[in-house]
Design a protein with these regions (language model features):
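Non-catalytic accessory regions used for complex assembly or targeting
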Residues: 38, 50, 104-108
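Short, Lys/Arg-enriched N-terminal segments with co-localized hydrophobic residues
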Residues: 1-11
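Short acidic, glycine/proline-enriched loop segments that cap or flank alpha-helices
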Residues: 18, 38-39
């Protein structure tokens, strides 16, 4: 008795990500829930921008790419069009084995 109560600090959601290099570009591949593909494009963009802001704040260089498993079991992605060929050449198993960082999502 008499001890100060521990101050509760709500932590930010943290995700495992794969920071990889493709050609001369750093990528931060973030696996997200399969329901992500059903969200409106504006919401997808907002979420991707939040991850990009968080990566920048964490000094984690690279373009954020969101990936998820679609209804056919294939990997879908949200990324710049210049990365389409590379992203079509990998799958969720590749992403899972490449996870090498954590990224806390800053919520605003």
């Amino acid at each position: 008795m008499g001890e100060a109560a521990a101050k509760r600090i709500d932590s930010m959601p943290t995700f495992q990500v794969a920071q990889v290099r493709h050609g001369d570009q750093d990528l931060i591949i973030v696996p997200v829930d399969r329901t992500f593909g059903k969200r409106p494009p504006t919401e997808q963009a907002r979420i991707q921008e939040a991850f990009q802001r968080s990566a920048t704040a964490a000094k984690l260089p690279g373009v954020v790419v969101l990936v998820w498993e679609d209804s056919r079991g294939k990997m879908a992605h949200r990324a710049p069009p210049t990365l389409n060929d590379f992203l079509k050449s990998i799958d969720m198993v590749y992403v899972a084995t490449a996870l090498n960082r954590t990224l806390s999502l800053e919520t605003r």
